[in-house]
From Swiss-Prot:
The lineage of its organism: Bacteria, Bacillati, Actinomycetota, Actinomycetes, Micrococcales. One of its GO terms (cellular component) is cytoplasm. GO terms for molecular function: 2-isopropylmalate synthase activity; acetyl-CoA C-acetyltransferase activity; magnesium ion binding. Mg(2+) binds at D49, H253, H255, N289. Catalyzes the condensation of the acetyl group of acetyl-CoA with 3-methyl-2-oxobutanoate (2-ketoisovalerate) to form 3-carboxy-3-hydroxy-4-methylpentanoate (2-isopropylmalate). Residues 40-314 form the Pyruvate carboxyltransferase domain. SUPFAM superfamilies: 2-isopropylmalate synthase LeuA, allosteric (dimerisation) domain, Aldolase, post-HMGL domain-like. Keywords: Amino-acid biosynthesis, Branched-chain amino acid biosynthesis, Cytoplasm, Leucine biosynthesis, Magnesium, Metal-binding, Transferase. Its main location: cytoplasm. It catalyses: 3-methyl-2-oxobutanoate + acetyl-CoA + H2O = (2S)-2-isopropylmalate + CoA + H(+). It is found in: Cytoplasm. This is 2-isopropylmalate synthase. Its EC number is 2.3.3.13.
Amino acid sequence: MRNAQKPSGMPVHRYLPFHEQIEVELPDRTWPTKRITTAPRWCAVDLRDGNQALIDPMSPARKLKMFELLVKMGYKEIEVGFPSASQTDFDFVRQLIQGGHIPEDVTIQVLTQAREHLIERTYESLVGAKQAIVHLYNSTSVLQRRVVFNEDQDGIMALATQGALLCKKYQETLTDTKITYEYSPESFTGTELDYAVRVCNAVADIFEASADNQVIVNLPATVEMITPNVYADSIEWMSHNLHPREGIILSLHPHNDRGTGVAAAELGYLAGADRIEGCLFGNGERAGNVDLVTLGLNMFSQGVDPMIDFSDIDEIRRTVEYCNQLPAPERMPYGGDLVFTAFSGSHQDAIKKGFEALERDADAAGIAVADTVWAVPYLPVDPKDLGRSYEAVIRVNSQSGKGGVAYLLKSEHSLDLPRRAQIEFSGVIQRRTDSVGGEVSADQRWEAFTDEYLPSPAGHPGGQWGRYALGSMNADTEEDGTTKLNTAMRIDGVEQRRSGSGNGPIAALLNILHDDGVDVRVLDYSEHALSEGGNASAASYVECAVGDRVLWGLGIDPNTTVSSLKAVISAVNRAIRDNQVD
């Protein structure tokens, strides 16, 4: 068959191939035959490298929430800022130290350029810390030497070594803090290897690198310039030529400009690296830093403990989205809404048979399904191991009604369902079409929606359902800031007065339900007006965990507080109707 591709006409002559800029020759490479068997040392740089790339940089409260998430997940080295660059970063470092937020086994990392007043300010920020990593960097690439610094190799070498000497000088001001040094030849991928290793070795010598006093040498793909195999060759070459090797913690800092940051990190780790820096879900400048979630769960999927807890991936994603004020893409590996969803009928059939095979294997071995080796077509990991439910797996595409239902609800009923609620309801429609067959009309879809999410009153043609119904209520704020909720509720058809307190009306209602034996947590919440004007009703959508099930509830009311409480009641009633709770 003849290749019909034609020249694009794009100005390719403007771009130099990497091998014409930087020579990387490693004929005796060993990394291709190696396997990843243990996790590297991790360093999360969300609070610095990630934060600087945000349209709306994190507030102190969002920074603290991100730090607490990283600690909870198990990261032990966390870059927390560039304290000499802004008062905001300086104050946040002080807040962490003085507020007692840093666990004993966690080391904060701070970034500084190789300039004396910046280094001095950096050490001032660390007063009182038990231990810290001081991360010194300067750019060494051919391009930046020429167009940014107008310096030759000797000039850039002097900048790096003088910076290291100044770090040692100001270290004397922190007698009670254990300092570990990190040095980054920024834009390493654009730097000649023989020059990069000379600079790194000179800095490591000043920092007195040894087996008992290890120095982190971090090799950033500040801009990803070449295929991951060439990056791995450069890492293995550096690993062979850094001295003393036992005194060096070789670190990677890949970016994703070419879309291969994860592959570069994995191959670089095989090539001799000990440590990887990155951000959750790949936040960072331009196309982002390497994604620590994908890296960790790639290892997990191969039976290697990432030493990081990803067991509640949705909560991790929600927190990261809140802190960054950026959404994680729906196709983001492991964490996106759609990554465990099979739209193809043949895929769904294979997955169904895979689950059946797991159950047979577990029965034959006399063990629980959760203890069997995972082997289900199209699903690289068990969604439940990441805190997901299997409901995502059986969601359907627009051919089964999702697109049409979403359009209908928004255009004719002004209901703008969150994406995950749209997908959940598409499963409801699919089950109905499977049971009755044929085309489902718009009226039938709307009836299905109201029957699913809005409890029916007595006398409804489809029969009454819904254990709980919210009647009159009032919410008062107590002196301590908590909310006292008093409500008249119909429970199994009997009106009862119930009261509860919490951090807001929803929390108070959750406590009322908890006292009634219903375990419910709110995972996500959104609301919008159904029309314009002062008399508009509000629609509230609440994603809840009720027992072992995650599902959505809907509430509609002129009062936004009441609509949100009705949404919680909707989710609880649905779970009870489906026999998910007693």
